[in-house]
Amino acid sequence: MEKKIDEIDFEKAGGIVPVIVQDNNTHEVLTLAYSNRESLELTRKTGLSWFWSRSRSKLWQKGEESGNTQQVKKILVDCDQDALIYLVEPSGPACHTGERNCFHHSLL
C-alpha cells in the first residue's frame, strides 16, 4: 500500500524521521540518516537521497561533494509511519570515511 507524505509522522521526533539506507540489491545497511518533509519531497522528486543534517541544520544530498550519490529505487514506511527505509543503488561508498557502509566498527 502506497503512503502519502502527509501520513509520515514527522512531529514525533521534532520534524524529522530516521532513514535506514540499504543497498537495493544486497539489502546491506549502508547508513542511518534523517529526513524532514522537504528532504523527503526532494528525494521523491529527484530520485536521489536527500537528508536533513542535524549537526549542520541544513538539507544535504548524499554525494553532493563526494560524487557518491545514491539512486533511490524504493522508499518503505514502517508500521508507525515514523521511520523510513531507502533502497538505493549507490555509486560509491556510503560513509564519509570511504568505507562502503557507516557500520564498520564493532561493539560486541
From Swiss-Prot:
Q: Which InterPro entries match?
A: PRA-CH (IPR026660), PRib_AMP_CycHydrolase_dom (IPR002496), PRib_AMP_CycHydrolase_sf (IPR038019)
Give, as in the UniProt entry, the pathway in which the protein acts.
Amino-acid biosynthesis; L-histidine biosynthesis; L-histidine from 5-phospho-alpha-D-ribose 1-diphosphate: step 3/9
- Per the record, GO CC terms? cytoplasm
**Annotated Zn(2+) binding sites:** 79, 95, 102
Question: What cofactor is needed?
Answer: Mg(2+); Zn(2+)
Per UniProt, subcellular location reads as:
Cytoplasm
Q: Into which EC class is this enzyme placed?
A: hydrolase
Main localization category: cytoplasm
* Claim: Ribonucleoprotein is one of the keywords in the record: no
Concerning NCBIfam families, the annotation shows: PRK00051.1 (NF000768)
Task: Describe its function.
Answer: Catalyzes the hydrolysis of the adenine ring of phosphoribosyl-AMP.
Family that this chain belongs to: Belongs to the PRA-CH family.
Q: How does it assemble?
A: Homodimer.
Q: What is this protein called?
A: Phosphoribosyl-AMP cyclohydrolase
Q: Which organism is it from?
A: Cenarchaeum symbiosum (strain A)
